[in-house]
Amino acid sequence: MKNLLLYNKIILFFIAIIFIISCNKSKNENDDYFFPGKEWVDNNGIAINAHGGGILFHDNTYFWYGEHKIEGKIGNTAQVGVHLYSSKNLYQWKDEGIVLRVNETDPSSDIYKGCILERPKVIYNKKTKRFVMWFHLEPINRGYEAARSGVAISETPYGPFKFLESVRPNAKTWPLNVQDFHKKKVSSEVKKIYGGGPEHLPKHVDSLNILGRDFEVGQMARDMTLFVDDDKAYHIYSSEDNSTLHISELSEDYLSHSGRYKRFFPSKFNEAPTMMKTSSGKFFIVSSGCTGWAPNAARSASANNILGPWKELNNPCVSRDSLTTYNSQSTYILPVQGIKDAFIFMADRWNPENPIEGKYIWLPIEIADDKVEVLWKDKWNLNFFKK
């Protein structure tokens, strides 16, 4: 009887060992996968909090900068600042803390607590050896009418970033593709700010001449991204009451605008712009429509030069739920290092009622026949690009 009990204990012990090994193996296998739309935790087991973000690759490390959200609708405003995570492999992320904090002591600061600080992006300037952050900024209690761009700087990718100023881009400067009618006197009808999407604009943006309206004070800049091409940096943003996309060259130190810019897709209402460049030199933009927090069908466009001309393409999403961009909105296109023409479409699944519960959608991009396609995958990893 004692031998039987001992035998049973030994059997149970080995079953437990096998179960633990199996669980650990399963856990380790899943560590090297992306699960779009599922909770994604950091090295501390806490959900990653970097919404509307972008990624910088520097010194063999990926740095993910994004909006830090808190619980409740108040989380749609900036209560903390910009959060940073770092990774060597894109699957596991280490919490590096808050790298740009909102100002909690000076109500006159443009980044005073409660402002709207969205879509932070960071690029590295090889000449100045500084890390430069740009973001969409709406000072507190202004709603979305200010449409400004904030800029901050740091000596390391880990911060802290020092807020320098906020601006309306390209004040008193016409775009390279300005038309004669833009320079004519602006009617009083256009003096007000139009909010929201195309349903709020009474006429075509060129008939209203919103470009001319904002000539003196600078152009509006809301949803945005940054792109570095051959050491020149560009600020791409929704302008003219969200109706028109601007691609604007930055100064050599990346801290201001050079004055060289063009406007594209007037009255097409492109938000959430993202950009990529293939090894063949082809540029692609993937953006969204303008429907507030509600998801919509993505758009895409291609060009052989970053300043155009740009050719409009179709919705790049080709799997189920393509008409809502898989219930998400674009935020960045990430080039995977070490793999030719490997790009990840980064998007946010917003939750405006409780922003901290927003999820991340990372999906592979396929390049085919001079177009890009974003494919839905419930589970995938970087081996997708090694086929």
Task: Give the role of each language-model region.
Residues M1-E29:
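Bacterial Sec-dependent N-terminal signal peptides
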Residues N24-K387:
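Carbohydrate-active catalytic/glycan-binding domains of CAZyme proteins
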